[in-house]
């Protein structure tokens, strides 16, 4: 199912959506933060999807617990370190970990740039102990408005040498991409690549805007592109990568069932598309789960899954020499 001669990558993976249950428990107790349960076992349903839950509101509540326990910069560093460990232990050869420093900082009023530094330090420490290649993507969380995104951008750009790209995430309907055109001009001027959450809650116009105005060369989720034949043609022609997260899309009610997921439609249209976990801590999944789902629920053959693996490497924010090195390590 997973082809061991091809690098296994996860390109759409939120660091702040992957906090271990026991880490939430330990940090909560360490910092005197009231948790919604009185044991580790009973905490899990409050912070992870259980069974067939499919509600965006429930999903976001669980996600909020992951940052509620980030009471100091050591906690941030720990979570970043554990993200590297989790990526390696799940069998990944390469992962791009994205994070929103504003979202991580806000509960306990941590310094935004300090959060960025703590994430970088935690990842560096993790890379000393685990065999996996990691790059970082900064997120601007549009839900908090333009001014907050400016603060976030400045904290991230102060350490741009440790980032490969910038992302726009959050409330796509309430805060459309055009509000952030100036922010992304600064990102382009800084020489960083751009990906954007688009076409998830909003329609295809949001994706056109992200590509044509923000400068995105990859799109997170993008499920609504399938209703716009011109966009599908454009995506295929220009190799705009779709970072697909099927289980997360089900958990957030972006799609009502795996049968409704447009992954196959993208593949049949020749669009570059990869499989990713999104918020693996909340969804309680790993990358291998997504490949199993792609085979059993989305109907992909082993040959198609191998192509999806290759797509991920092609889409990655890597130099050609880094791409070749990933393949060489699998030979």
From Swiss-Prot:
EC number: 3.5.4.4
Any single Gene Ontology cellular-component annotation: cytosol
Reaction(s) catalysed by this chain's protein: adenosine + H2O + H(+) = inosine + NH4(+); 2'-deoxyadenosine + H2O + H(+) = 2'-deoxyinosine + NH4(+)
Entry keyword set: Hydrolase, Metal-binding, Nucleotide metabolism, Zinc
Active-site residues, as the UniProt record annotates them: 200 (proton donor)
Cofactor(s) listed in the protein's UniProt record: Zn(2+)
Enzyme class, broadest EC rank: hydrolase
Cofactor detail note: Binds 1 zinc ion per subunit.
Gene Ontology molecular function terms on file: 2'-deoxyadenosine deaminase activity; adenosine deaminase activity; zinc ion binding
List of residues binding substrate: 14, 16, 170, 279
GO biological process, one term: inosine biosynthetic process
Binding-site positions, Zn(2+): 12, 14, 197, 278
Site entry: Important for catalytic activity: 221
UniProt-listed PANTHER family: ADENOSINE DEAMINASE
Function, in words: Catalyzes the hydrolytic deamination of adenosine and 2-deoxyadenosine.
Family the entry assigns: Belongs to the metallo-dependent hydrolases superfamily. Adenosine and AMP deaminases family. Adenosine deaminase subfamily.
Name of the featured protein: Adenosine deaminase
Organism field: Shewanella sp. (strain ANA-3)
């Amino acid at each position: 199912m997973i082809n061991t001669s091809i690098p296994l990558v996860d390109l759409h993976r939120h660091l702040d959506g992957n906090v271990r249950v026991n880490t939430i428990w330990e940090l909560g107790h360490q910092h005197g933060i009231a948790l919604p349960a009185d044991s580790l076992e009973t905490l899990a349903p409050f912070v992870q999807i259980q069974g067939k839950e499919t509600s965006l509101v429930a999903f976001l509540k669980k996600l909020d617990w992951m940052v509620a326990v980030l009471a100091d910069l050591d906690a941030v560093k720990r979570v970043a370190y554990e993200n590297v460990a989790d990526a390696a232990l799940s069998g990944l050869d390469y992962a791009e970990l994205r994070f929103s420093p504003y979202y991580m900082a806000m509960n306990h009023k941590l310094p935004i740039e300090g959060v960025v530094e703590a994430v970088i330090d935690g990842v560096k420490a993790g890379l000393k102990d685990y065999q996996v290649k990691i790059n970082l993507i900064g997120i601007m969380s549009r839900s908090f408005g333009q001014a907050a995104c400016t603060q976030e951008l400045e904290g991230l750009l102060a350490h741009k040498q440790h980032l490969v790209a910038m992302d726009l995430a959050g409330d796509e309907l309430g805060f459309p991409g055009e509000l952030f055109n100036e922010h992304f001009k600064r990102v382009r001027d800084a020489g960083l690549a751009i990906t954007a959450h688009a076409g998830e809650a909003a329609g295809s116009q949001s994706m056109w805007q992200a590509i044509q105005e923000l400068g995105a060369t990859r799109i997170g989720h993008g499920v609504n592109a399938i209703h716009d034949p011109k966009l599908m043609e454009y995506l295929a022609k220009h190799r705009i990568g779709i970072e697909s997260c099927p289980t997360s899309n089900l958990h957030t009610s972006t799609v009502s069932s795996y049968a409704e997921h447009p992954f196959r439609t993208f593949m049949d249209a020749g669009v570059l598309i990869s499989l990713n976990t999104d918020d693996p801590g909340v969804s309680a999944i790993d990358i291998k789960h997504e490949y199993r789902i792609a085979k059993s629920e989305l109907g992909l053959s082993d040959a198609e899954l191998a192509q999806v693996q290759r797509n991920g490497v092609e889409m990655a924010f890597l130099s050609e020499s880094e791409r070749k090195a990933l393949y060489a390590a699998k030979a």
